């Protein structure tokens, strides 16, 4: 269910704005998106796992807040990130 260390490092390397960048909104949103997609697949097979469903909703809310922050801070970075991740915004 959780991301492997290798997969998380791949995502960080792909979306980092500079070397060693793990805290930028782009990286955080990309990692959250991967976790959300993984959890969505889990919930498709385990429909009654309400505990994980609540965790999914919390992750979606955190991602929404980060995207709102990025949109207010820099619209071009926001649009580029949405396009790269394939989010419907």
UniProtKB/Swiss-Prot annotation:
Biological processes annotated in GO: translation
Any one cellular-component term (Gene Ontology): cytosolic small ribosomal subunit
Entry-linked Pfam families: Ribosomal_S15 (PF00312)
Single GO molecular function: structural constituent of ribosome
Keyword tags: Ribonucleoprotein, Ribosomal protein, RNA-binding, rRNA-binding
Superkingdom of this protein's organism: Bacteria
Family listed: Belongs to the universal ribosomal protein uS15 family.
Stated role: One of the primary rRNA binding proteins, it binds directly to 16S rRNA where it helps nucleate assembly of the platform of the 30S subunit by binding and bridging several RNA helices of the 16S rRNA.
Subunit structure comment from the entry: Part of the 30S ribosomal subunit. Forms a bridge to the 50S subunit in the 70S ribosome, contacting the 23S rRNA.
Protein name in UniProt: Small ribosomal subunit protein uS15
Gene responsible for this protein: rpsO
């Amino acid at each position: 269910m959780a991301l492997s260390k290798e997969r998380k490092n791949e995502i960080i390397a792909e979306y980092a704005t500079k070397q060693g960048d793990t805290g930028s909104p782009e990286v955080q949103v990309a990692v959250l998106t991967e976790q959300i997609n993984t959890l969505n697949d889990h919930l498709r097979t385990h429909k009654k796992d309400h505990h994980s469903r609540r965790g999914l909703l919390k992750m979606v809310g955190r991602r929404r807040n980060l995207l709102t922050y990025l949109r207010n801070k820099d619209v071009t970075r926001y649009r580029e990130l949405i396009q790269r991740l394939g989010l419907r915004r």
